[in-house]
Amino acid sequence: MKTPERNLVRRRLGRGGFTLTELLVAMACVGLVLAGLTGLFVSGQQSFLVGANQVEAQENVRIALQRMADEIRGAGNGPSGAAFTAIAAGQTATSLVLQNDWNGNGIIEPGVTTNVNGMLRGEQVTYSFVGTQLMRQESGVDAAAVPLIGGVQGLTFTYLGADGATTAVTANIRSVTVAVRGGPQTRTPSNPCAPYTYAEGNVGVAMIDTARIRNR
């Protein structure tokens, strides 16, 4: 039979040890703490990703919308009375061709470039929505369509007449409403045809603007 003195010696020498129950309880407590910390880390990472993607998406959509609106407003530039439309025939809900008679000869020549304020300009500019990219091509300047922004989830052109009603007649178009929806272009979702999941930084920025064609 062990005496109290011998038990005291064992404790002083660090040979008391732990019971299996104590060890399991300690491991369970550590596991709970680690699970909580992991949850906080994942949540913080997702929140940061959403915020960063939101900023990027807003900037991309804003730049693209402003660029298109500016060029739509300036379309139709040319000598007074020239018989050409500011937007070429065949416009659709996701593409349009803007026209300007930069050399002033009264006709639109897609293969001709003109020096305008020190910059070569083509007489047609095409905007189109392909896949997840907004494409722009300037005739005589760009050999092929150039991506303006990526991460585009939707693009819609709506054509309006002088009375503000929608029109499909090219010669009657006086304004164009442009609606763009996009996400970040530096990352792509696991399924490009579906919206981002929250874990991927789910964002979707939508902007809309109506541009009045000043030369018509």
Provide a role label for each language-model segment.
Residues 49-50, 56, 72-102, 168-171:
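Short, glycine/small-hydrophobic-rich surface segments
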Residues 2, 6-8, 102-104, 141-216:
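Short linear sequence signals and composition-biased patches located at protein termini or domain-edge surfaces
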Residues 57, 61, 127, 171:
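Aromatic-acidic/polar surface patches that form glycan- and anion
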